[in-house]
Structure formats: C-alpha cells, structure tokens
C-alpha cells in the first residue's frame, strides 16, 4: 500500500513538473518568433497589399510573400538578436507591389534584433536599433 501511495505522489509531481516545462518553453524568444506574421509597417509606413513572413524554428528558415514574389532563406537567432541570411526570390513583376518587394528585401538584409510583445513582432536594425518592420502574428 505504501508503494502505491508513494508511486502515485511521485507520478503527480512528475506530471505537474512536465506541465511547467511546457509553459516555459512556449514563452522563449525562439518559440514566440516561430509562426506566420502579417506585416503592418515597413520603415514606419503602412503597407498594402498584404506581406507575409513565416519563421520556422525547426530548420531556421524564413519564408515570405511580398505581395507578388515569394522569398526564402535561413536565419540565426540568439535571445533577441536576429540575423537573416541571403534570400532567394521569384522574379515576377506585378504592378503596384514592387515597392513592397524592394522594401522588404532591404529591411530583412539589415535586421539585427527583434522583439515580440502581445503578438506584435518588431524587427530592428543592427546598428541604430531603429524599428524597420512591424508585423502581427497570425492566429493558428
């Protein structure tokens, strides 16, 4: 009987402990960065049409669509620092969307850090800590 009670108590502690670990892991900067974001501003200017960014923490890949062309590449992230490598892109021309195409490429090349607060991602330049881009995390 004592073994059964002891085993039950140990199992309870184990289950409760595992539950807490999941909460901590879910709030790490890497976990918060993972997912799809809809870009709201580039260099403090509202943008249209819709620009999407997706960060995949499993293989550190970034993917996006700037309104016309898809782009992708690799990123490295450590705490709040973020470095986006060279991006590959499709090369179509779309009236009205090319301004965003060029702007997003320039911004992502200059990112040095990020912050996520209340589901809003802000990318900052590496040198001046100036906000380059804001985006809202999509609900999954």
Briefly describe each language-model feature range.
Residues 1-29:
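Bacterial Sec-dependent N-terminal signal peptides
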Residues 18-140:
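Lipid interaction determinants
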């Amino acid at each position: 009987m004592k073994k059964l009670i002891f085993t039950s108590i140990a199992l309870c502690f184990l289950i409760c402990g595992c539950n807490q670990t999941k909460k901590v892991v879910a709030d790490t900067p890497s976990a918060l960065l993972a997912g799809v974001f809809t870009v709201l501003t580039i260099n403090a200017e509202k943008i249209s049409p819709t620009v999407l960014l997706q960060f995949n923490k499993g293989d550190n890949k970034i993917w996006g669509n700037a309104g016309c062309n898809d782009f992708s590449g690799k990123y490295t992230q450590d705490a709040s620092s973020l470095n986006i490598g060279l991006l590959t892109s499709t090369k179509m021309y779309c009236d009205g969307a090319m301004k965003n195409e060029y702007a997003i490429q320039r911004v992502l090349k200059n990112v040095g850090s990020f912050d996520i607060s209340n589901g809003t991602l802000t990318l900052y330049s590496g040198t001046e800590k100036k906000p380059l881009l804001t985006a809202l995390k999509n609900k999954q």
